[in-house]
Structure formats: structure tokens, C-alpha cells
Amino acid sequence: VPHPLAILQTVFGFPGFRGRQLDVIERVMAGVNTLAVMPTGAGKSLCYQVPALALPGTCIVVSPLIALMHDQLRAAEAVGIRAATLTSVDTNRAETIERYTSGALDLLYVAPERASGSGFRELLDRAPVALFAIDEAHCVSEWGHDFRPDYRLLRPLLDRFGHVPRLALTATADAHTRADILAQLGIPHDGLILAGFDRPNIRYAMSPRSGTTKQVADLVAATPGPGIVYVQSRAGTDKLADALSATGRPVRAYHAGLDPAVRAANQSAFVASEDMVMCATIAFGMGIDKPDVRFVAHAGLPKSIEAYYQETGRAGRDGDPAVAHLFWGADDFARARQRLGEVAEDRIAGERVRLAALASPG
């Protein structure tokens, strides 16, 4: 079996591992089921890509979004990894299945709804599986900020192939969510690797709202380079994008109300740009591979501390200085308290704690 460091240097061109990457990789290669909670920008994908290249068989990567899978596929293929996606929009599914069964894939990306189906289990019986990597693993927990019920259906697949190590990965999970991920995915409590959350290159700031458009425009003017501005509504996103266009910077909008082709074009333009501002709802950002984002602004309160950490963590992934600025108003907290009334009774206590954390001056 090739040494992980040799793979890192020859395939990826990095001189050495960062943070807890090697700890995670060595556990996975020893067959230990693991949950890795690592900061945004810490290189979580290497934690399954390196074992996938070292171990016999194919690594199955469960990922929540088709766009995210296709971004990861392009990045993997760019360094020569044999990878494929198996999604509803792929027209080459028969070819991908043939590549899997003939042992010609290092990585196979699938959505949780496909991975949990009986047909997929039968496919995996036809060739060796090296590893299950469950990306964005907080989606398995009702306590997480982005719960996806399909993630709850993965356990039978994992248990069917109980001899195959499983690696769950997330950047955002509080203690309650971590415990739930471990329980839902059958990972022992001593399988947790918790890296630090500090992002020292990001300068965090908060300001009371007093004319949001001007405040954000001033931030844009003061901060060269690409940036993301999170807005709480679709209409607000379009309105702010129009207003910021007057700054002279290229500005695009991104929200679920736009035509999918427009969303995709705007995302591609942002990823390729050196100075674009993206005004977006929280629909934008998961898996965006853009290391040079120089600022992330919030024109209102995010829905939780975890969501705030994940969204601001899209800034400065290249390690250079970046800014995260939150513009808040008392009405944000009023709306958040109103939303508590829509939460299931067994989750109200936890959501109150989250809201209190957002309101805390520390």
C-alpha cells in the first residue's frame, strides 16, 4: 500500500498534510469508522481521496447536491483521479456502471437517495468497495442546520457492507449534532476527530443595520476581490444586487427562484471572476470551490451559529486575509423567535440555545 504522504505529493502536489488530515487518513486506512469535524477550508476531501488511491476498490462518496458532486468530480479528474458521478442528470450512467464493475474507478459520487436504494446495494455487490465517505454529514441529524431525511436512510447500506470503513465529514456540528451523527451512522464515540474551528485569517465584524444597502456598498468598495453577500429573501437579493451594480463591480444574484440555467451561469461566472460580488440566499455556497473569496457579508441574521460558521467559512480558503461582516437588526431576533413556534417540540430547547448563542455579545 503506498504511503499517504507519497500520494499527497505525487498526485496532489502538496508538500505535507495540514491539521488533522493525516490522523483521519491513517484511521480510515486502518479500517476504523470515523467522524471528522474539521474547519472549512481544511481540505476535508483529501481525507477520502488519499485512501481511495491507496486502497483496493472504489470509494463511494455520498454528497447532498448534484452541483457539488460535479464540482468535486472536475477537481478530482483534474489531478488524474478516476472518478464519476451517478446522478439523475448524468447521461453516461451505463458507462459509469461498467467502469465501476470493471474496477476502473477510484471515486464514485452519489446522492443519498440513490445510495439508500436497493438497486445501488446490488450494484456494490458486483465490485469491491474501499470506503464510504459521507460528505456534509451534519445533514443526517435533525439537530443539524441542514437536515436531509435521505441521509437517515444510509445506515442499512453501511451495515450491509459492515467490513468497509465509513468516514463522515462536516465542518459544522455542535455536540448534540455530533452525537446524533455518530449514532445515525454507526460510528463509535471514540471514532470522533475534532479539529479546531479557528480561522485566523478571517477578520470578523458586526454592525447594527442603518441603511443596509449603503453599508454593504461601503464594504464592497473597501474590499477588493470576490465576495458573497447573504440576503434573507429572494426579493431582497434581487434588490440588493441591482443597487450594488452602481458600485461599478460586476454583481450577480443567486436564489431558488431563478431559472436553473441562470443560477448555473451566475455560479460559473462567480467562480471564474476576480472581483465579482454574488448576492445570494443560503441556497448558494455549499461546495463552491473558490479559494480567493475576500469577504462574506450577511445583510441579516443567519439561522444558526453553525450556518454562520459555514457561510463565513467560504471566505479566505487560500489562507490570505478575508473579512466576514454581519449587519443585524432587532427585528432579526423577533423573526427568529417567531420561527421557534414552527419547530417540533422536542427541538425547541436546542433551538433556543442556538438563538441565545447568536445574541451573545461574546
Protein language model annotation of sequence segments:
Residues 2-11, 15-19, 23-45, 52-55, ...:
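Helicase motor core with emphasis on the C-terminal RecA-like subdomain
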Residues 360-362:
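Short acidic, hydrophobic short linear motifs in intrinsically disordered regions
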